[in-house]
């Protein structure tokens, strides 16, 4: 009898690997794409898993497995890898997939010293709520893998020493006009 592989969650707890959850995430990311194989990504990923692997490393392994399948004949793997990368970035930035409300996000990053306080001085809560209504976070799902990696590597506010990410693409784009207000 095989014992389930134990993984290390983001909070440090150990628990058995949940292959069904991994399958659901890859299947979700593959929705609507042509010539991508969820099972191919799973197979390429699973052989790299080891006892105690961190869930964040599992996610990075899956992203790399999808990216490695990008070719002239199977270009949609670039979108599969991108969607998985966006999912991972949001988990790193917010602790979960769904981004917070814009005002709450800005307030938090001002408090952390990542955004300038002028952002809160220059706009009312109502204006932030109105701007939040313009954001469609699902636009991130149309990016290519190369675009997501460019955003992550060059443009998103982050701690370049620890790799901690503080924002996602749609917040970046909305706040770009006020980038002078970002510390």
Predicted feature descriptions by range:
Residues 1-183:
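Extended catalytic cores of very large enzyme megasubunits
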């Amino acid at each position: 009898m095989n014992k389930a592989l134990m993984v290390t969650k983001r909070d440090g707890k150990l628990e058995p690997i949940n292959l069904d959850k991994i399958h659901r995430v890859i299947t979700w990311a593959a929705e609507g794409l042509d010539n991508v194989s969820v099972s191919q990504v799973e197979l390429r990923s699973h052989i790299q898993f080891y006892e105690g692997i961190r869930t964040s490393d599992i996610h990075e392994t899956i992203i790399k497995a999808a990216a490695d399948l990008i070719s002239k004949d199977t270009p949609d793997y670039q979108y599969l890898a991108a969607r998985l990368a966006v999912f991972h970035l949001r988990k790193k930035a917010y602790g979960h997939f769904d981004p917070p409300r814009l005002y709450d996000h800005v307030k938090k990053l001002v408090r952390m010293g990542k955004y300038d306080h002028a952002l809160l001085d220059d706009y009312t809560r109502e204006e932030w709520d109105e701007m939040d209504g313009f954001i469609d976070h699902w636009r991130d799902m149309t990016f290519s893998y190369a675009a997501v990696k460019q955003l992550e590597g060059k443009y998103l506010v982050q701690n370049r020493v620890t790799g901690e990410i503080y924002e996602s693409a749609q917040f970046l784009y909305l706040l770009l006009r006020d980038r002078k207000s970002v510390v």
